[in-house]
């Protein structure tokens, strides 16, 4: 079983108790993975995924880009536990999970060339306001 298939299996298993994705998202995981991977060629070497939730786009991108480093930020403890467990199960050495709000993170602890991505975190205004200390 490849890593993306294993990721989908873990996501569906954990979703039963952790509400990681909606029922409609669970039925269309391939579509959400494909959507997440659509930015793959545009990313630099260091990426912060804001509001990682069930791992879209961070986990999917980390699987397809093993030479890039991904910092997954998720304030929900259950979702963070899923992200940490999944990155360990998939042996994703390029993933670091932070169970914090973005406002709590110190930019100086991250690379200067860090790129920020997000999917369903909130409006553009909310995303910019929450992460402005990284910009």
Which positions does each model-derived feature cover?
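S-adenosylmethionine
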Residues: 67-71, 75-135
């Amino acid at each position: 079983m490849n890593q993306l298939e294993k990721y989908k299996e873990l996501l569906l298993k954990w979703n039963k108790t952790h509400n990681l994705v909606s029922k409609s998202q669970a039925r269309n995981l391939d579509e959400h993975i494909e959507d997440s991977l659509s930015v793959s060629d545009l990313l630099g070497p260091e990426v912060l995924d804001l509001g990682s939730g069930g791992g879209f786009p961070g986990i999917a991108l980390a699987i397809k880009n093993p030479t890039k480093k991904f910092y997954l930020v998720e304030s929900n403890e259950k979702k963070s536990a899923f992200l940490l467990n999944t990155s360990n199960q998939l042996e994703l050495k390029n993933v670091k999970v932070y169970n914090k709000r973005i406002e709590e993170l110190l930019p100086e602890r991250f690379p200067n060339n860090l790129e920020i991505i997000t999917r369903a975190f909130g409006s553009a205004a909310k995303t910019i306001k929450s992460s402005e200390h990284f910009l």
